[in-house]
From Swiss-Prot:
Pfam families to which the protein is assigned, alphabetical: RuvC (PF02075)
Name of the protein described by the UniProt record: Crossover junction endodeoxyribonuclease RuvC
Organism per entry: Polynucleobacter necessarius subsp. necessarius (strain STIR1)
Binding-site residues, Mg(2+) 2: 64
Keyword field contains Transferase: no
Length: 168
């Protein structure tokens, strides 16, 4: 299955694409979408991501959740960027999973308090890359890896906690 992970940002949005076959992870592509001019930022982000989706044709998507920033304006603007990303993903009829940065770091490094260089190094190792991608692309690859691992875990609650009919 091909996954795309997205690390949304105000000026730079990272993307990472991996193929997953059982436990085998294969790097496909990664990079950033730059969306400079604030007046055109959301349109540029949407168009840039659509181009990536058309080129690599992922089957599932995952995006990092918004964290509450000290500056409410920054949080609002990041939410708008996430909206453009989700709109592009949904327009391609992709299922979209969302993960907190803490959960992604736990899945990749083993601790939710990992620093960006630690995430970069583990992404490099997990995908057997010669060098680590930049921080935005590396974070996006981490989101894709986290989502792929979570998708492989069977949903035990849906089968074990099904209410049973009472006999009379």
């Amino acid at each position: 299955m091909r996954w795309i992970g997205i690390d949304p940002g105000l000026c730079t949005t990272g993307f990472g694409i991996i193929d997953v076959d059982g436990q085998k992870l294969t790097y496909v592509a990664s990079g950033t979408i730059e969306s400079g001019d604030p007046a055109k930022r959301l349109g540029a982000l949407y168009a840039g991501l659509k181009e990536v989706l058309e080129t690599y044709r992922p089957e599932s998507a995952a995006i990092e959740e918004v964290f509450l920033n000290v500056n409410p304006r920054s949080t609002l603007m990041l939410g708008q960027a996430r909206g453009a990303v989700i709109a592009a993903l949904v327009s391609e009829k992709l299922p979209v999973a969302e993960y907190s940065a803490l959960r992604v770091k736990q899945a990749i490094v083993g601790t939710g308090r990992a620093a960006k260089p630690q995430v970069q190094e583990m992404v490099k190792r997990l995908l057997r890359l010669n060098r680590a991608p930049g921080t935005d692309a590396s974070d996006a690859l981490g989101v894709a890896i986290c989502a792929a691992h979570h998708a492989q875990i069977p949903n035990v609650f849906s089968t074990t906690l099904t209410p049973k009919k009472r006999s009379k």
